């Protein structure tokens, strides 16, 4: 068994990652503010105040528990990086608009599903349906034997116009940062992904750079 180490991000990399998260959040807020018919009929709670829920966003931290995902040279696991990104995104999203209800597939390394890849993926889709999510966003981190491989990539369904619009905003904004480059927006028609394909709502799987490239993560 390999020991999972917590990587300390370099200050400049951390700032870039947080900036990316904020840009993604901003994209969601714009779209959600114009979302007139939400599946949600509940109220979001912040502190002692209650707000009408304008939409529910499920944030998925890829992998977790038995599944560490990709592993960087220093031992950092993908599951730790995606969890950090997911929690920070949710935190900032709720801060920017308390009317947005944020739910997660996991908030720690503990997972509630069996140690089976198929059941793992099914469980994430079921959770989105149970929470009546309006949007599903899954964080992943890429890796490659070549440490110079870089860039971020988005995966969406071919007929998912809302997610196509979201990814366009993300790519447009990220292109202005001195971080990394866009590897494109790919449809699951050619790259099947259960957590995206089985959703009936806008769904994106976003690979935020390469864990094997220390200039990115």
Where are the model-predicted features located?
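N-terminal Lys/Arg-rich, disordered targeting/topogenic segments
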Residues: 1-13, 20-22
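Hydrophobic membrane-insertion alpha-helices, especially the h-region
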Residues: 15-31
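Generic recognition of cysteine residues
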Residues: 20-22, 149, 171
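Active-site-adjacent mobile loop/cap segments within catalytic or ligand-binding domains
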Residues: 131, 138, 145, 184-217
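Active-site-adjacent substrate-binding region
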Residues: 161-187
């Amino acid at each position: 068994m390999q020991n999972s180490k917590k990587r300390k991000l370099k200050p400049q990399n951390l700032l870039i990652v947080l900036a990316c998260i904020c840009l993604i959040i901003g994209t969601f807020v714009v779209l959600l503010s114009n979302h007139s018919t939400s599946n949600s009929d509940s109220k979001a709670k912040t502190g002692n105040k209650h707000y009408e829920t304008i939409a529910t966003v499920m944030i998925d931290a890829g992998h977790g528990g038995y599944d560490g995902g990709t592993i960087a040279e220093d031992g950092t696991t993908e599951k730790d990086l995606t969890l950090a990104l997911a929690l920070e995104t949710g935190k900032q999203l709720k801060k920017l608009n308390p009317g947005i209800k944020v739910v997660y597939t996991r908030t720690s390394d503990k997972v509630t599903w069996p140690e089976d890849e198929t059941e793992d993926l099914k469980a994430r889709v079921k959770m989105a349906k149970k929470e009546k999510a309006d949007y599903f966003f899954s964080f992943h981190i890429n890796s490659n034997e070549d440490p110079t491989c870089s860039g971020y990539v988005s995966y969406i369904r071919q007929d998912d116009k809302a997610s196509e619009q979201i990814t366009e905003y993300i790519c447009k904004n990220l292109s202005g940062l001195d971080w990394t480059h866009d590897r494109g927006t790919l449809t699951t028609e050619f790259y099947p992904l259960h957590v995206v394909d089985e959703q009936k709502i806008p769904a994106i799987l976003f690979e935020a750079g390469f864990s094997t490239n220390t200039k990115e993560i």
